[in-house]
């Protein structure tokens, strides 16, 4: 179920503070965050935000199409390497 419009978008305060600081200083340095649950707001467009995937921070450039989505949607947390090969099938 989507979030109520009455409540507005959720963005962690510490992330929003870093976004405003980066805009004021025109910094191109990526903003590191662990907040995958934060929604992308129009203030973030053009910034690079490094979102944590459980192991490392993956840089993501914010575009207009991303507004309204959550940061975690753009960084994969699971790495699928395929099923193990069947040893019996290899011998034939």
Swiss-Prot record:
Q: Which SUPFAM superfamilies match?
A: Ribosomal protein S19
List UniProt keywords, sorted A-Z.
Ribonucleoprotein, Ribosomal protein, RNA-binding, rRNA-binding
Any GO CC annotation of this UniProt entry: small ribosomal subunit
Q: What's a BP term from Gene Ontology annotated to this protein? A: ribosomal small subunit assembly
Q: Which Gene3D superfamilies does the UniProt record give?
A: 30s Ribosomal Protein S19, Chain A
Q: Does the keyword RNA-binding apply?
A: yes
Q: Which GO terms describe its molecular function?
A: rRNA binding; structural constituent of ribosome
Cystine links in this protein are none
A Pfam family for this UniProt protein?
A: Ribosomal_S19
Name the InterPro entries for this protein.
Ribosomal_uS19, Ribosomal_uS19_bac-type, Ribosomal_uS19_CS, Ribosomal_uS19_SF
Q: Does the keyword Transferase apply?
A: no
NCBIfam families found in the cross-reference section = rpsS_bact
What is the purpose of this protein?
Protein S19 forms a complex with S13 that binds strongly to the 16S ribosomal RNA.
Give the protein family.
Belongs to the universal ribosomal protein uS19 family.
Name of the protein in question:
Small ribosomal subunit protein uS19
Species of origin reads Francisella tularensis subsp. holarctica (strain LVS)
The gene coding this protein: rpsS
